[in-house]
Design a protein with these regions (language model features):
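Short loop/edge segments at beta-strand edges and connector loops
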Residues: 47, 126-128, 198-200
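Helix-to-beta-strand junctions that scaffold the AdoMet/dcAdoMet cofactor pocket
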Residues: 92, 164-166
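Class I SAM-dependent transferase core
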Residues: 1-71, 75, 108-122
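Short alpha-helix immediately C-terminal to the canonical SAM-binding loop
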Residues: 106-108, 178, 182
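SAM/dcSAM-binding transferase cores
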Residues: 183-239
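Conserved beta-strand signature within the Rossmann-like core of class I S-adenosyl-L-methionine
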Residues: 167-177
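Conserved SAM/SAH cofactor-binding pocket of Class I
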Residues: 61-151, 157
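Short "lid" loop at the C-terminus of a central beta-strand within the Rossmann-like core
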Residues: 130, 175-179, 204
Length: 239
């Protein structure tokens, strides 16, 4: 392998996490497939290896610093090009992952990736978030739901919390100043059965990239009225 993964390896060490040579090779194959497919399909604006290493791979795996020990099933909602779901599935082969996306051509690409990497712990689902949240196959089925999707916290919570088991967690990857968003989303999170923990703020090592994790505990079942019909959570966020 000609590409240098030392940044990722060293960063993971600072987080007390390790990947085997096989897992690094799986990430490298994923990188190659991502860049190749990106030539004919808009998957990511980040294509330079060093940037992918930091902004996709390290960022996705930064969740290893806070992932609860009791998690066995994970859903990545709005997975897009497979982040954070594919790196997490590589890093955690003993956990079961469901990756959901609304665009079927992205799901088809990710199926190619899953097959090429031999990931037996990944299920791919083509569905809108609102549909998935109302489908009994997925509703309240997961110990942990994660999302790197760009949306306000109220909207993301309406998409994601219906999928979380009572006693489970929703973790949102965020960047930038989120204080106002947090203040505005408190009632929405509570309506959906969640309780927000204190945000976890950090910088990706050796970069000026600041990130935060919003961890929401699922304390009670989400009312049947949520998620609302397709398009409504984004147009009219709960407050």
């Amino acid at each position: 392998m000609s590409r240098d993964y030392s940044y990722l390896i060293n960063t993971l060490k600072t987080w007390n996490f390790e990947l085997s040579d096989k897992q690094i090779n799986q990430l490298d194959t994923f990188y190659e497939m991502l860049i190749e497919k990106n030539k004919v399909m808009n998957l990511t604006a980040i294509t330079e290896f060093d940037e992918v290493l930091v902004k996709h791979f390290a960022d996705s795996l930064s969740i290893c610093t806070i992932i609860p020990d009791d998690v066995k099933s994970v859903c990545d909602l709005g997975t897009g090009a497979g982040f954070p779901g594919i790196p997490m599935a590589i890093a955690y082969p003993d956990l079961q992952f469901t990756l959901i996306d609304s665009l079927n051509k992205r799901i088809k690409f990710l199926q190619e990736v899953v097959d090429a990497l031999g990931l037996t712990n990944v299920t791919l689902v083509h569905a809108r978030a609102e549909e998935a949240g109302r489908n009994k196959l997925y509703r309240e089925q997961y110990d942990l739901v994660v999302s790197r999707a760009v949306a306000n916290i109220s909207t993301l919570s309406e998409y994601c919390l219906p999928l979380v088991k009572v006693g489970g967690y929703f973790i949102s990857f965020k960047s930038g100043d989120i204080e106002d968003e947090i203040k505005q989303s408190g009632k929405a999170i509570s309506k959906l059965g969640g309780k927000l923990q204190k945000p976890v703020l950090f910088n990706l090592p050796d970069t000026n990239i600041s990130r935060s994790f919003l961890v929401i505990d699922k304390e009670k079942s989400t009312p049947k009225a949520y998620p609302r019909k397709a398009g409504t959570p984004s147009k009219e966020p709960l407050n």
